[in-house]
Amino acid sequence: MANKVIQLQKIFQSSTKPLWWRHPRSALYLYPFYAIFAVAVVTPLLYIPNAIRGIKAKKA
């Protein structure tokens, strides 16, 4: 496996993007993370109206 420190150092130091977006494969990791994070944040918010009205989830 070749040592790519110099190439990566040039990429990271010459880029004006935020640090977490500088790597060439960062979109591969960040877009799925953002999607899962959005679902994890929004899903509990969908249950708030039922919680306010006192409606419990149906048991299967």
From Swiss-Prot:
> Which residues point to the Mitochondrial intermembrane side?
54-60
User: Topology relative to the membrane, per the entry?
Assistant: Single-pass membrane protein
Molecular function in Gene Ontology: oxidoreductase activity
- Iron is among the record's keywords: no
Residues annotated as transmembrane: 30-53
Question: Would you identify the family this protein belongs to, as annotated?
Answer: Belongs to the cytochrome c oxidase VIIa family.
**Miscellaneous comment in the UniProt entry for this protein:** Present with 639 molecules/cell in log phase SD medium.
Q: What is this protein called?
A: Cytochrome c oxidase subunit 7, mitochondrial
Q: Whose protein is this, by species?
A: Saccharomyces cerevisiae (strain ATCC 204508 / S288c)
State the gene name recorded for this protein: COX7
